[in-house]
């Protein structure tokens, strides 16, 4: 799940908060996949 993924990345990258870094990652932000594209 996403929490376990965050802990795994945190072990590799110290002094960062990976859960927050990837919070807005994805094709679209917002509920149900609607909203402005986040990545091109």
From Swiss-Prot:
UniProt keyword list: Disulfide bond, Secreted
The keyword Lipid biosynthesis is annotated on this UniProt entry: no
Free-text tissue specificity from the UniProt record: Expressed by the venom gland.
A GO biological-process term: lipid catabolic process
CC annotations in GO: extracellular region
Signal peptide limits: none
Compartments (UniProt record): Secreted
Main subcellular localisation: secreted
Claim: Secreted is one of the keywords in the record: yes
Single GO MF descriptor: calcium ion binding
Subunit structure as annotated in this protein's UniProt entry: Heterotrimer of alpha, beta, and gamma chains; non-covalently linked.
Function summary: Heterotrimer: Snake venom phospholipase A2 (PLA2) heterotrimer that acts as a potent presynaptic neurotoxin by blocking synaptic transmission and synaptic vesicle recycling. Enzymatic activity is essential for the neurotoxic effects. May act by binding in a calcium-dependent fashion to neurotonal pentraxin-1 (NPTX1) and neurotonal pentraxin-2 (NPTX2), but not to neuronal pentraxin receptor (NPTXR). Also binds to taipoxin-associated calcium binding protein 49 (RCN2), a protein localized in the lumen of endoplasmic reticulum.
Family assignment from sequence similarity: Belongs to the phospholipase A2 family. Group I subfamily. D49 sub-subfamily.
Stated name of the protein: Neutral phospholipase A2 homolog cannitoxin beta chain 2
Species: Oxyuranus scutellatus canni (Papuan taipan)
């Amino acid at each position: 799940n996403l929490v376990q993924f965050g802990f795994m990345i945190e072990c590799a990258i110290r002094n960062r908060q990976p859960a927050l870094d990837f919070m807005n990652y994805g094709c679209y932000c917002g509920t149900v996949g609607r909203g402005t594209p986040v990545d091109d």
